[in-house]
Amino acid sequence: MGILHLQRLLSMDRFGRSALKPVWAIVLLCAVIAGCGTASKPDENATPAAAASTLPPVRPSRQYSIEQFIDSTSVNGAFFSNDESKILFNSNKSGVWNVYSMPITGGAWTAVTQSATDNNYAAAHFPDDGRVLITRDQGGNELTHLYVIGADGVETDLTPGRNLRAQFIEFSHDFKYFYVSSNERDPRFFDLYRYATQSYQRTLLFNNDNGYDLGSISADQRWLTLGKANTTNDSDLFAVQLDSGKITRVSDHLGQASFQEQGFSSNSKWLYYTANDHGEFAELRRVSLDDWKHESVQKANWDVQYSYFSRNGKYRVTATNEDGSTRVRLFDGASGAEIALPQLPAGEIRGLTFARSEQRIAFYVNGDRQPNDLYVLDFGGKPRQLTQSLNPVIDPADLVNTQVVRFESFDKMVIPNILWKPHQASAQNRAPALVWVHGGPGGQTTRGHNALIQYLANHGYVVLGINNRGSSGYGKTFFAADDGRHGREPLWDTVAAKHYLQSLDYVDDAKIGIIGRSYGGYMTLAALAFQPDEFAVGVDIFGVSNWLRTLESIPPYWESFRLALYQEIGDPKTQRDFLIETSPVFHADKITKPLMVLQGANDPRVVKAESDDIVAAVKKNGVAVEYVVFEDEGHGFSKPANQIVGYGKILEFLDLHLKGVAAGAQQP
């Protein structure tokens, strides 16, 4: 059950819902195997010069085009076939995301879906035959349906209807059924349905009229976990008996604390969960479903990010979020003893999946200079690499490794960051720089491959990925430090980040811009509007410009955390003046620096009107503005053709306004 729980979390991430601040954060669940590329915690008292001195020496670096960067293959997802001879996964190599299958020994890919327009993602492989489950929306509108593709290739929509959103949860332990959530009855809430594996006959199991977030189902099919977001920093966990409807609160606590379910044990005796009510960081616990007594399972000086079992409980995997990287450990499911893993490829491990037999796993390796590559490991054997994702034209040595650095902000709060330094930057060859702001609020900039940032670094830009106050991964006090303060203290952290960059001898201190996606796009606009003299240029990628509109137009299926969002950002009914004060569109007359805006026309979270309005308002100032709209994208640009256009235009814009080099001109 546990791996399905993780896959559900990964799916939630794809649609912008993290376990902590669920509406906005886009947080990659990734892991680093112990001893394989895990970054040690830097000295928090290190001076900027000391931090800079640990970076690699200056060296020549070949520059690559955006076409060459995007020509690397993107892959994710991993599902073993019923006989474990093949693996199901996703790739956008055709120009949109489609589902593919390949032998676990490697070899040719077989296309399971062949869409030329809408993205398809694998949800599961059926346990006893060749059928597969996939999900698909329309042009990025996030109204996903669940489809079954038969062994004959015929596709059937299992969740027909208009304006609904459905998601696969998991198969029952006996594989006679599978579970699906859908908001077809009430667009605000997701109900739980059970489908018969053979006939697809559907039964409503849980009528969700109170806005719970649905979780895992126990192997004996008696229990369902429910989550409830009170605020972005406080949530409760419940377990409901499906036969009687009796709900038991698991999360008795005082004060603000977050509780997140981590699935049931395979014998249905224990419910595992993480909670941070005993300190700054989330620890792993379990509660007996017989007497409701709680036990601590694992704690660390960082958040326990997730934990799950193999199918029959032989193994348990746990990951901790450690300073922008996540460390994975494997345990014996019965004794709890840690199991030494065989030598695995260095780098971050993502999307680890146990086979049904518990004899092998599939996972992705991802590093700063390495996009996702799929591996299969038979326990007792050596890992087999199934994909070669990096464009062979690109020499990994020309890409850059990241470094964790810290600086003190305006009020002495220590701010963690991820730094990308171009090979060619030096005190004699100072480079322009960018402050990169993650999504959220409540996201986290992490280590790992980022094609856009590597592209910018490859073309001579220092990039500082700030984890401003309010970011996840650094304790609940730090996480809550931005509540009700957006457009103020978190923004002032970005100004302090600029000052940190100016302290580095290889940065041109007069050529520093700001860039971000989603909430990071809002921060970009806020920086240009509220701190107009600080940054030389801004790039807003589908960012909020008007909090009033955004909060009043949220999709109905966000109802379960609408009030928590109001607590975080502001209530449009009772805090209208505050939201106007913190919305850049109402202060666009103060924006005097060049601005670029990129937007998906089908974005349901930051609607296109947000970008239309800020672009029109800034143009009235006589400021250089470039606006790029993709008609077939939503909240994120998933199609390689659009990435090539969008990312390429970002570099051209930055080169013109930070380097003074027009598109197509030869750079020195």
Q: Which positions does each model-derived feature cover?
A:
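Conserved beta-propeller blade repeats
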Residues: 72-90, 116-136, 146, 162-181, ...
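C-terminal motif of bacterial Sec signal peptides marking the signal peptidase cleavage site
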Residues: 33-35
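Active-site-proximal cap/loop segments of hydrolase catalytic domains
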Residues: 468-668
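N-terminal secretory signal peptides that target proteins for export/translocation
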Residues: 1-20
